[in-house]
Amino acid sequence: MPVTVRRATKKDAARVAELSVALAEQHVGYDTARFARLITRDGAERFYGGQAEAPDAVVLVAERDGEVVGFAYMQYEPVLYAELAVKVACLHDIFVDKNERRSDIGKKLLETAADEARGFGATKVLLSVATQNDGAKAFFESVGFYTTMHEMMCLLD
């Protein structure tokens, strides 16, 4: 069945929360010193439910047969001083259910996110990807993203 991508509503928040917890756990698995286990399903449901109605953000869901199989969360920042950037859409989260990967769902989410970013007035999309996530890095590069920064961390005693 075909996949459709649309803006999320509060009714989607529970499933988006479930997927976001899986995304967070994936990151914690990469590096427990960098990624803290902070996200709860209830907290994520409240957060994404609220962001679905925020004027400067968009939560997208990908559906197949009426089931949400992926999501993306993006915020628009007209001026992002910390990144020395203007007119930026920050793609904070994008995740596809592990059983649905490699079926162009991620690409459809990104295409829709890019359209939404343009609608906000953005001229670029920024995202971060975990160093260990080779599949995601290759995917993002395949659709036109390129590396501009490297995050570094030093643990303090």
List the model feature ranges, each with a label.
Residues 61, 67-76, 90, 95:
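Conserved beta-strand in the GNAT
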Residues 118-128:
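Conserved GNAT acetyl-CoA-binding A-motif
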Residues 24-47:
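Conserved GNAT-fold acetyl-CoA-binding loop/helix
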Residues 85-98, 150-153:
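Conserved acetyl-CoA binding element of GNAT-fold acetyltransferases
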Residues 100, 104-112:
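Conserved acetyl-CoA pyrophosphate-binding loop and the N-cap/start of the following alpha-helix
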Residues 45-61, 90:
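A short helix-loop-beta-strand connector motif used in the catalytic cores of GNAT acetyltransferases and
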Residues 1-14:
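Conserved N-terminal entry element of GNAT/NAT acetyltransferase domains
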Residues 107, 119, 131-149, 154:
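Conserved active-site alpha-helix within GNAT-family acetyltransferase domains
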